[in-house]
């Protein structure tokens, strides 16, 4: 397993070390990673996580399969089931920009307590190459994470207060985004099954990595979601299961 990480690390080095985004959190990792990659794919050659291969085996395999000489952006999901897992993964992919979506109780049997879980997720901020983080001002831990990253560029998002990137309901049919590159709206019909805050994370990550408003709009409209999540099933009696 260690050899996989070393090979993946050296492969990424050999390919010119393209701009890399690392995503972790208890919920939403896969959706945010996939949507961010979809937006960036509108203008860039992107390497991203295969499925939800987010551990010390899956991350190297994703790098092996998706990487090529033309890759200029990477978006990787980083998962953890025990202490130091995230540290190991950031040492493999060396992210330039990271985000910690949220922390809530999950896999507690392997962490022991909430403090261990939180500190493990915070390892996403630890790599010396990481010089920018995206933080949600609405999150309970925002102030703590801002203090941890006072030596980095902090880009903020919010659905409730002033931030670099904001989202709100424009009317019954649109979401309205305020961003550092301008404001725009998108029809809700293109966002079915996406949590607004996850869309905002993806928009901010992609735009900070170089995407423009047109890329965001096209990416949101073309994204088909994560397979097996938020799918609708209509039963014979017409009831709907999601």
Task: Tell me the role of every PLM-derived stretch.
Residues 57-71:
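P-loop NTPase switch/communication element
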Residues 18, 97-242:
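Acidic, Mg2+-coordinating active-site environments of NTP-dependent enzymes
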Residues 65-69, 91-93, 126-128:
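Conserved catalytic network of the ASCE P-loop NTPase/AAA+ motor domain
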Residues 72-83, 241-242:
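Switch II (G3) loop of P-loop NTPases
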Residues 4-8, 36, 40, 62-63, ...:
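Buried hydrophobic packing segments
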Residues 1-22, 31-32, 37-38, 42, ...:
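Short, basic phosphate-binding NTP loop
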Residues 81-92:
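Switch II of P-loop NTPase G domains
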Residues 44-58, 102:
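Short beta-strand-centered segment that lines the nucleotide-binding/catalytic pocket of NTP-utilizing
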């Amino acid at each position: 397993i260690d050899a996989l990480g070393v090979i993946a690390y050296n492969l990424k080095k050999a390919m010119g070390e393209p701009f890399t985004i690392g995503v972790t959190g208890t919920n939403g990792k896969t959706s945010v990673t996939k949507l961010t990659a979809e937006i960036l794919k509108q203008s860039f050659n992107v390497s991203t996580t295969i499925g939800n291969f987010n551990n010390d085996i899956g991350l190297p395999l994703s790098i092996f399969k998706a990487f090529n000489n033309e890759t200029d952006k990477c978006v990787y999901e980083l998962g953890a089931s025990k202490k130091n897992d995230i540290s190991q993964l950031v040492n493999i992919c060396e992210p330039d920009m990271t985000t910690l979506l949220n922390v809530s109780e999950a896999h507690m049997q392997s962490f022991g307590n909430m403090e261990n879980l939180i500190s493990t997720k915070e390892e996403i901020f630890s790599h010396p190459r990481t010089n920018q983080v995206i933080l949600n001002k609405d999150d309970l831990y925002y102030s703590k994470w801002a203090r941890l990253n006072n030596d980095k560029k902090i880009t903020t998002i919010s659905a409730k207060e002033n931030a670099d990137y904001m989202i709100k309901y424009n009317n019954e049919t649109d979401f309205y985004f305020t961003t550092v590159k301008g404001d725009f709206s998108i029809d809700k019909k293109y966002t079915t099954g996406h949590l607004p805050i996850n869309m905002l994370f993806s928009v901010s990550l992609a735009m900070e990595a170089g995407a423009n408003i047109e890329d965001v709009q096209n990416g949101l409209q073309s994204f088909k979601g994560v397979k097996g999540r938020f799918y609708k099933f209509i039963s014979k009696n017409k009831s709907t299961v999601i």
